């Protein structure tokens, strides 16, 4: 007996590989002209929430939100209302901040694991 599949489910490769010639990020200005709306392909709630949280803590941002327009598409939209700053620069700066935080977290984790292994290796020799 075969397992039924969703007829509208995209192919796995379409969720992981950006087609040739397509842009990863597109920027639009909202109808009112006060917000930047960034459409980011091949991303989901994981990165959307991280970026939104970082933007919400940025004093140069009045408003930040994200949404995933459709659950079967790996596309998110991030909306930023900047306080007189370029939205593209704010997004870029906040993504770099997140990358630095993740890098620091990774280094700390690797160091702690190494210390744990060294400590247990010493105890194992007794």
From Swiss-Prot:
One Gene Ontology term of the molecular function aspect: DNA binding
Annotated family: Belongs to the archaeal Rpo11/eukaryotic RPB11/RPC19 RNA polymerase subunit family.
GO BP, sorted A to Z: transcription by RNA polymerase II
Gene from which the chain derives: RPB11
UniProt-recorded name of the protein: Probable DNA-directed RNA polymerase II subunit RPB11
Function statement: DNA-dependent RNA polymerase catalyzes the transcription of DNA into RNA using the four ribonucleoside triphosphates as substrates. Component of RNA polymerase II which synthesizes mRNA precursors and many functional non-coding RNAs. Pol II is the central component of the basal RNA polymerase II transcription machinery. It is composed of mobile elements that move relative to each other. RPB11 is part of the core element with the central large cleft.
Protein localization: Nucleus
Taxonomic classification: Eukaryota, Sar, Alveolata, Apicomplexa, Aconoidasida
A cellular-component GO term for this protein: RNA polymerase II, core complex
Cytoplasm found in the keyword field: no
Highest taxon of source: Eukaryota
Signal sequence region: none
Quaternary assembly: Component of the RNA polymerase II (Pol II) complex consisting of 12 subunits.
InterPro entries: RBP11, RBP11-like, RBP11-like_dimer, RNA_pol_Rpb11_13-16kDa_CS, Rpo11-like
Keywords from the UniProt entry: DNA-directed RNA polymerase, Nucleus, Transcription
Chief site of localization: nucleus
């Amino acid at each position: 007996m075969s397992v039924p599949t969703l007829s509208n489910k995209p192919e796995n490769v379409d969720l992981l590989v950006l087609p040739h010639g397509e842009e990863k990020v597109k920027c639009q200005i909202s109808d009112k002209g006060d917000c930047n709306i960034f459409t980011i392909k091949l991303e989901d709630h994981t990165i959307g929430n991280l970026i939104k949280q970082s933007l919400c803590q940025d004093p140069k941002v009045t408003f930040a939100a994200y949404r995933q327009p459709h659950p079967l598409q790996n596309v998110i939209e991030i909306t930023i209302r900047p306080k007189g700053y370029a939205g593209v620069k704010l997004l870029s700066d906040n993504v770099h901040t997140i990358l630095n935080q993740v890098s620091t977290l990774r280094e700390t984790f690797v160091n702690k694991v190494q210390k744990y292994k060294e400590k247990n290796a010493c105890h194992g020799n007794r």
